[in-house]
Amino acid sequence: CRDSQALSQPNVPKKNSTTAVSLAILGLVAALLAWRIVATNMAELIVQDGGEDAAALALNWNKKNAQAQFSEGLRIAKANPADATAYLSSAIRNNPTDGPAYAAIARLKEDNGNLAAAEEAMQAATQMAPRRVDVQLEAARFWFRRGDIARAMGHMDVVLTFGDSLRDELFPVLLNLAEDPATREIAHAKLLKQRITWWPQFFNYAAAKATNIETLRVLFQMQTGGPNAVTTKGLQAYLQRLQRENLW
């Protein structure tokens, strides 16, 4: 009878043991979460600090840090294009809206001769970063290399609109296109069908720097009657150039 009563008693030690295991698991999970937070924060700090080995050090803390993957991909791009592409692809997986990473992949694909993949990557880059000046400038240069001047100028418009500090550097490129009869129309005529915020400044630049007065005349005609009508300063610059050439 005593034996049957003993058997019917609850096993208190088992309950205590289960509770202890649960607490241990919770403690382990909390520790892992805390470590993950520390590792993530350390990786971010290292990347922000910069330095030649910053990306590699950051990846030691957090292998999924997209910025570190991007930076490491750029660092080794020339020496090891395959590994660079792998890093950049991982950066995109961890940050699918990373326009600069797509642009970097496009350049690697272009250098490797895979032009279809390069075009696809560059298109993704500009879609993900529609107003990032660095990405749009890379896209403009890409399409210039591909011979698609009209498409390149569409990206150049974004660059010159949002990156006005680059105008002094890029206006000579645009003027060269305007000076060449083979590229003048395709580079500027289509663009001038819409409002271009930087056009008045460029026209004034062209009035002063164009080597051929015919270039200026054509640009003047292109803008006439459209949304980029000549400004007062532009007209003055145009007339002054005509006077300088003894044509007015």
List each model region and its residues.
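Short coil turns that delineate tetratricopeptide repeat
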Residues: 60-66, 96, 130, 164-165, ...
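TPR alpha-solenoid repeat register
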Residues: 68, 101, 135, 169-170, ...
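Hydrophobic alpha-helical transmembrane segments in integral membrane proteins
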Residues: 31-53
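Structural motif corresponding to the intra-repeat A-B loop/turn of tetratricopeptide repeats
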Residues: 78-79, 112, 146, 177, ...
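Canonical positions in the second alpha-helix
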Residues: 57-58, 90-91, 124-125, 159
